[in-house]
């Protein structure tokens, strides 16, 4: 039985990581499949080390293409070491970010362009794509305000980018959602955490009713 690969996407401040945690705990109680949660960049030791390099605010001289290639390298190792084995075992994989993030952040945010980022990641993933994507949408002003108010850890390199950068990121996410309606479910993340969690959970069980 092949597994199910679900990704969680959204601009900074959408509450994506918190929603994934709540939803995964609920799914673990009700799903017929084992739930595997992971994140990008990260999820395995090699990729977590790359994550530290990418997000360290002291690395302010990092070239945007270097950044894009580091994300793709972390993604490749994460995919072959954790995601694909879990899918082959029939598990339900919930991943905090995947290729859509690179398209939005490096392709649009960094203005590298969508085509080269898509090409880099096609090589890294060998065409592996999520079965379903939850996109948590929030306007850039609200997202940045939430980051400033709620982040307990250090603000990272991407969080510290200006409003226009985050607006470009969100615009690309909205474009991706419009172009991929069968894969991407857009959810209004301006709602309370409880309502967003419920909407996300319902979207998953409606998509995969046989899993419950």
Curated annotation (Swiss-Prot):
Q: Which InterPro entries match?
A: P-loop_NTPase, Thymidylate_kin-like_dom, Thymidylate_kin_CS, Thymidylate_kinase
Task: Write out the entry's keywords from A to Z.
Answer: ATP-binding, Kinase, Nucleotide biosynthesis, Nucleotide-binding, Transferase
Name the chemical reaction catalysed here: dTMP + ATP = dTDP + ADP
Coiled-coil positions are none
* One GO BP: dTTP biosynthetic process
User: What top-level branch of life does the organism fall under?
Assistant: Bacteria
Tell me yes or no: is Manganese among this UniProt entry's keywords.
no
Spell out the GO cellular component terms annotated for this protein, sorted alphabetically and separated by semicolons.
cytosol
- Its EC number is 2.7.4.9
The EC category is transferase
The family database entries (Pfam families) matched by this protein are listed as: Thymidylate_kin
> Which residues bind ATP per the record?
10-17
The UniProt GO MF terms for this protein read: ATP binding; dTMP kinase activity
Which PANTHER family does the UniProt record give? THYMIDYLATE KINASE (PTHR10344), UMP-CMP KINASE 2, MITOCHONDRIAL (PTHR10344:SF4)
- NCBIfam families listed in its UniProt record: DTMP_kinase
State what this protein does: Phosphorylation of dTMP to form dTDP in both de novo and salvage pathways of dTTP synthesis.
Q: Which family does it belong to?
A: Belongs to the thymidylate kinase family.
Protein name, please?
Answer: Thymidylate kinase
Q: What is the lineage of its organism?
A: Bacteria, Bacillati, Bacillota, Bacilli, Lactobacillales
């Amino acid at each position: 039985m092949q597994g199910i690969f679900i990704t969680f996407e959204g601009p900074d401040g959408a509450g994506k990581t918190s929603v994934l945690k709540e939803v995964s705990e609920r799914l673990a109680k009700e799903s017929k499949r084992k739930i595997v949660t992971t994140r990008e960049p990260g999820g395995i030791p090699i990729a977590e080390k790359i994550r530290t390099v990418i997000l360290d605010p002291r690395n302010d001289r990092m070239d945007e293409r270097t950044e894009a290639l580091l994300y793709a390298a972390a993604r490749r190792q994460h995919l072959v070491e954790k995601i694909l084995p879990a899918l082959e075992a029939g598990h339900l994989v919930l991943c905090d970010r995947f290729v859509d993030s690179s398209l939005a952040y490096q392709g649009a945010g960094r203005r590298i362009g969508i085509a080269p980022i898509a090409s880099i990641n096609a090589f890294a993933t060998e065409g592996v794509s999520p079965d379903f994507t939850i996109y948590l949408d929030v306007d850039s002003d609200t997202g940045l305000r939430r980051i400033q108010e709620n982040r307990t850890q250090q603000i990272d390199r991407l969080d510290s980018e200006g409003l226009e950068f985050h607006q470009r990121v969100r615009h690309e996410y909205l474009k991706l959602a419009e172009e991929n309606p069968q894969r991407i479910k857009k959810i209004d993340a301006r709602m309370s955490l409880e309502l967003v969690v419920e909407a996300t959970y319902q979207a998953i069980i409606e998509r995969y009713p046989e899993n419950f």
